[in-house]
Amino acid sequence: MTMSQEENPVKPWGGRFSEPTDAFVERFTASVTFDQRLYHHDINGSIAHATMLASVGVLSEDEKTAIIDGLEAIRSDIVEGKFDWSISLEDVHMNIEAELTKRIGITGKKLHTGRSRNDQVATDIRLYLRDEIDNIAKELTRLQSGILDLAEREADTIMPGFTHLQTAQPVTFGHHLMAWYEMMTRDYTRLMDCRERLNQSPLGAAALAGTTYPIDREQTAALLGFNHPTRNSLDSVSDRDFAIEFSAFAAILMTHLSRASEELVLWASAQFNFINLPDRFCTGSSIMPQKKNPDVPELVRGKTGRVNGHLISLLTLMKSQPLAYNKDNQEDKEPLFDAIDTVKDCLRAFADMVPAIESKKESMYEAAKRGFSTATDLADYLVRKGIPFRDSHEVVGKAVGYGVETGKDLSEMTLEELQGFSKEIQQDVFDVLTLEGSVAARNHIGGTAPAQVRIAVENAKQELEGRNS
């Protein structure tokens, strides 16, 4: 695609003005450099509008056919990179309309009857975002499917669970991965909620008050796949809630991916040594030959900041605008478009990478043995022996202190040593102090027991199948 700036082109709104637009102002106010990506949806909206105008007698059938054929020819040229975009024509809408008029003559000037760029762009963005939401939903589902496959493989793999990044209790790797899955399930439902709310047609709201032509908004809404028309013309052209809502979804999703990225970076480090990331998802150092850097999760973590920033940009953009449309709204597109592009790239990176993660089971297991991760199990054991929990907490705390001094884990102490803290402790205590016993005992809905992880994975697989049916 080429870009040009014509000398004093005829403006579609030029009748009111006595001098041409300043060349700098043309560049400053133009949006075609970034909104041209809306061309497909702009053409679809125009075809629906022309079809409706013909059905209510504003256009003849011949005029409708000429407009639609002309628009389809323009679409083909854009796809093939043969279309010349003009900054002087400001935006995607005026570029396409001007070219249509150039090709089919005066009939092209009738296309905009009963329509404003205000409802036109609102329609275009909704159509575009709806398609991108569907694309993102597919990629998010692919990532979740990969998480389930890995969680199923790692249902029995024991690792330390952390709070405050300190060893807390043993969990299974599969259970930890299913926590990622749950985060992203919430993301998916938020995305679908956003889609439902945006799927209303503003076309026909015109500039702000509607139009005097006998338009059929139900028809254009149906032709474009919307659930129904919007209910208030002022709100229709002013509303950008759908862009803000999508950006909020994107920010939360990216925050979840960032948290997962941080864990992958830590786990892949020599200090943790929990996982191996395949070489194809890592890079090296220009000076240190030994380095294998987890660049993909690091970059996902870094890109979260820009997506979060886009949400703030859109909120700030809208916060002081009176009704109805204002030129400020031109600034909604770049943050929205970049958020969409970034989310898609990050989801693709994760969806490709996660199924290829290799766990280092022995290293995970040894790490879980350190840090007295079964201390809570010992406290619960004493409760079952009739000791109040707060008292058992005190007893186990003293046993841990002894372990720190002697370098012994609770499971490594003798029965005599343990009974020095409570006579209620018997030989059966060693059944609950093993890592395997600890995770197996948490055998309830949402628990870390391998059996529960497998149930959770199976339920989640059925959930994903339901999305695709």
Swiss-Prot record:
Keyword Nuclease annotated: no
GO cellular component, one term: cytosol
Domain of life: Bacteria
HAMAP family: Arg_succ_lyase (MF_00006)
Entry GO MF terms: argininosuccinate lyase activity
CDD domains, per the entry: Argininosuccinate_lyase
Keyword Cytoplasm: yes
Pathway(s) this gene product operates in, as recorded in its UniProt entry: Amino-acid biosynthesis; L-arginine biosynthesis; L-arginine from L-ornithine and carbamoyl phosphate: step 3/3
EC number of the protein: 4.3.2.1
EC top class, as a word: lyase
UniProt record, GO biological process: arginine biosynthetic process via ornithine; L-arginine biosynthetic process
Reactions mediated catalytically: 2-(N(omega)-L-arginino)succinate = fumarate + L-arginine
Location(s) in or outside the cell: Cytoplasm
NCBIfam families assigned to the protein according to its UniProt record, in alphabetical order: argH
Full protein name: Argininosuccinate lyase
